[in-house]
Amino acid sequence: MFIWQRKSILLGRSILGSGRVTVAGIIGSSRKRYTSSSSSSSSPSSKESAPVFTSKELEVARKERLDGLGPFVSRLPKKWIPYAELMRLEKPVGTWLLYLPCSWSILMGAMMQGATLSATAGMLGIFGVGALVMRGAGCTINDFLDRKLDQRVIRSVERPIASGRVSPRRALVFLGAQTLVGMGVLSLLPAQCWWLGLASLPIVFTYPLFKRFTYYPQAALSACFNWGALLGFPAMGVMSWPTMIPLYLSSYLWCMTYDTIYAHQDKKFDIKAGIKSTALAWGPRTKSIMKAMSASQIALLAVAGLNSGLLWGPGFIGGLGVFAYRLFSMIKKVDLDNPKNCWKYFNANINTGLYFTYALAVDYILRLFGFL
């Protein structure tokens, strides 16, 4: 026992004396997050391949996390904050990007059905709550499955599970609570939505694993992240597959585009950590591929409008033009080798999607009052 303690002290001195520490070292020494048996079972090769961050880099990551909590999350009780971070409440961009295709399908379905303003507004509100909860559940799943990988990427090293502020067990309990709330929201929708919503759950719970064995994890994320483009129609009493499928595929390609930009933020660390993404698969061809996807996205959105009889509304056709302009402008301007610039243009997709929501809302109001 004495020998073991002495070795631990010497190891601690060597860590403190060095200006560079591994994330695993920081995590193990500060919160005893791993047992001695798990440490001894890890292979030397895995330790050697783990990226090494300076203590300054880790402190900068911690400061950026605290500075990024925002006025709402930072005012929560201290014990609640890590769980709010698990849901990414301080980064609402994901909730918006999940919600926007829902709003398109709801508004298009409302126009096709001639739904009242109160029914449409109510459904937009229900889907808003659902987007917040299920995006949070998706982030919790992602952080639970990626807790080891997150320790090897500086941007994610401060996430609640990776940093040890939330244990894996507590994260699973929290995930269960979020899933129950999400199922409660789903129960408020018509029965036609239930089987369609439940069909998305397998990929929701497994998509974080895709980055381990394929360079196209964005394909899996896009498949589940835009499910609301399908759900909004039956929620409004419409089941029009010729409209639903092209809208879903259009949203799918949009997600592929913006999440590829997101992936370019971490590509240097991803190479070292063995994490795969379209950013690494496409490399210098990324912008050309994104242009092709965006052109296809706009075409599919036009097909959805044509099949629904909504294409020639002033809002739809105008919104389509704004959508196309902003997409191609983003692709031209984004610096894929600059993480901060990638984050800026990734966030810009909120407004891009919102403008189309506003455009559909204009057509809906015009139809509601008999002008279309």
From Swiss-Prot:
Membrane-spanning intervals of the chain? 92-112, 114-134, 171-191, 193-213, 229-249, 298-318, 352-372
**Leader sequence segment:** none
Here the transit peptide covers 1-42
Coarsely, its chief localization is mitochondrion
Q: PANTHER family attached here?
A: 4-HYDROXYBENZOATE POLYPRENYLTRANSFERASE, MITOCHONDRIAL, PRENYLTRANSFERASES
Question: What's the stated role of this polypeptide?
Answer: Catalyzes the prenylation of para-hydroxybenzoate (PHB) with an all-trans polyprenyl group. Mediates the second step in the final reaction sequence of coenzyme Q (CoQ) biosynthesis, which is the condensation of the polyisoprenoid side chain with PHB, generating the first membrane-bound Q intermediate.
* Family, as annotated: Belongs to the UbiA prenyltransferase family.
Give the membrane topology.
Multi-pass membrane protein
List where in the cell it is found.
Mitochondrion inner membrane
- The protein's name: 4-hydroxybenzoate polyprenyltransferase, mitochondrial
